Amino acid sequence: MNRELKTRIIVLKNQLKVFTMQTLAVTEAITTLSEAERKFGLSRSESKDFFTEWYDQLPEINPNDRANLEILWRRYIYHRSGGHLLESTVMLLLVLPLLTIAGLYDPPFRIKAEESIAINVSDSEETLQGRIDVLVLRDRLWIIVLESKKTMLSVWSALPQTLAYLMASPNSDRPTFAMLANGDNIVFVKLDGKQYAMSQVLSPLVDRGELEVAWQVLRKITHNEI
């Protein structure tokens, strides 16, 4: 292999690496909500009519799906009762089964994984370190799972990075959505143009009915909006 060809290959590899890391670099660089709003020119919508997908005209749950959601809830409660869930157990025990019951692994949906990114959250006493795992559904719905080895991070901790992911969507002319989960809580985010809004926090650990609501929101977003 001559020197010129080797040089071209190296250049192509470097270009590919830069391309695949662009979104990752942006999400790592943005650590606060004010940074995300300033960088992307975003503002939070206070209109109740902006994000109706999480509460208005939600789909009915058939008996089979309700039974599967109950099994999922009881299984998660069983494992959660043993203490804080570490590493990828939230993804394994809660998020992936929820996506399965919602039918999001079947045509026409395709799911891809983004590279995990680190997250640091500072409070008055210490800096909490964790990780964000990301799944993307048809470049319209981002599934964000927060994990921490020492303590549970609030779902709000990943909102700045989530907005960065949504802004990087190739479908910027249409609304995009995200579901943030840390195991105990789930919250949905909508971005449309330069405005965003969040749902109320759903707490499946406290109320099984809120796991059903999360399922309903997923179904509505993916089957009506995507």
Predicted regions and their residues:
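A short, conserved, highly charged catalytic patch centered on acidic carboxylates
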Residues: 8, 13-175, 187-226
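Central hydrophobic cores of alpha-helical transmembrane segments
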Residues: 180-182
